[in-house]
Amino acid sequence: MFLLTPVLVAVVCILMVWIFKNADGATKRREEEPRARAEARPWVDEDLKDSTDVLQVEEDADEWQESEEEVEHVPFSHTRYPEKEMVRRSQEFYELLNKRRSVRFISNERVPMEVIDNVIKAAGTAPSGAHTEPWTFVVVKDPDVKHRIREIMEEEEKINYLKRMGPRWVTDLKKLRTNWIKEYWDTAPVLILIFKQVHGFAANGKKKIHYYNEISVSIACGIFLAALQNAGLVTVTTTPFNCGPRLRVFLNRPANEKLLMFLPVGYPSKEATVPDLPRKPLDQIMVTV
């Protein structure tokens, strides 16, 4: 029979301790890696996630309205330009939008409301899933309401900068010279808050699915920015990290609406500056197959 000598027993014990320690360390590393990766990623506001959920229709069928309406189809009216005219128009439109910048220094000079109306009507021409048009544009001009919006936003933004966003994100923003203090929310003559409707309501009170509501509203936001630039106004896009629910309640918006983006709108102040950032050239953003 094989007998374990004291030396051999000691070696075996040391080996077993080493194996267990390494196994325990590997387990801890596996547990910590996802947490570290999560902390390195930008913080995600759950309120901003697209809430299109077809399964919900099957689970709560009685609450949802199926679309049965018939829509007449009519001939499409189209203006076709000569090729040279197409090139000229496309180049001029590009040059116009290439001048668009995120401006954080906004004058308190009054903006014609007819211009705001037209800009929002232009945004409302955006395509949407099943033509549900799941957007609501809230226009705020009242100084007291604007100031309260600023207070709510700055309270949450301070937490974002100090805790939620993480050091990498905050470092990446340093070149833009931004922080949680947003004076332009008071000075801008108009604030536009853009809500996505996660579902709608039929005439009988039943819910209507708004397919791809966040993508649809995001397209409308892009057209909105282009229309502002075309009208000679400036803005800076702001995402409502964690202040969306509070602002929704403050503005008395219904529970089916979620704040997607809000923008101060006006003319640039005389002392306005912007970071001198280049845009990617065409060969870095386009692939032809």
UniProtKB/Swiss-Prot annotation:
How does this protein lie in the membrane?
Single-pass membrane protein
Query: Which residues hold 3,5-diiodo-L-tyrosine?
Result: 130, 157, 161, 182
Please give the cofactor(s) recorded in the UniProt entry for this protein. FMN
Catalytic function, reaction form: 2 iodide + L-tyrosine + 2 NADP(+) = 3,5-diiodo-L-tyrosine + 2 NADPH + H(+); iodide + L-tyrosine + NADP(+) = 3-iodo-L-tyrosine + NADPH; 3-iodo-L-tyrosine + iodide + NADP(+) = 3,5-diiodo-L-tyrosine + NADPH + H(+); L-tyrosine + chloride + NADP(+) = 3-chloro-L-tyrosine + NADPH
UniProt binding sites for FMN:
100-104, 128-129, 237-239, 279
Spell out the Gene3D superfamilies in the cross-references: NADH Oxidase
Q: Name one GO cellular component term.
A: cytoplasmic vesicle membrane
Pfam families in the record: Nitroreductase
**Known tissue expression:** Detected in thyroid (at protein level).
Q: Which residues cross the membrane?
A: 1-21
- Where does the protein end up? Cell membrane; Cytoplasmic vesicle membrane
Q: What is the enzyme's main class?
A: oxidoreductase
Under Enzyme Commission nomenclature, its number is: 1.21.1.1
**Protein family according to the UniProt entry:** Belongs to the nitroreductase family.
Any idea what job this protein has?
Answer: Catalyzes the dehalogenation of halotyrosines such as 3-bromo-L-tyrosine, 3-chloro-L-tyrosine, 3-iodo-L-tyrosine and 3,5-diiodo-L-tyrosine. During thyroid hormone biosynthesis, facilitates iodide salvage by catalysing the oxidative NADPH-dependent deiodination of the halogenated by-products of thyroid hormone production, monoiodotyrosine (L-MIT) and diiodotyrosine (L-DIT). The scavanged iodide can then reenter the hormone-producing pathways. Acts more efficiently on 3-iodo-L-tyrosine than 3,5-diiodo-L-tyrosine.
Query: How does this polypeptide assemble, per the annotation?
Result: Homodimer.
**Protein name (database record):** Iodotyrosine deiodinase 1
Organism, by scientific name, is Sus scrofa (Pig)
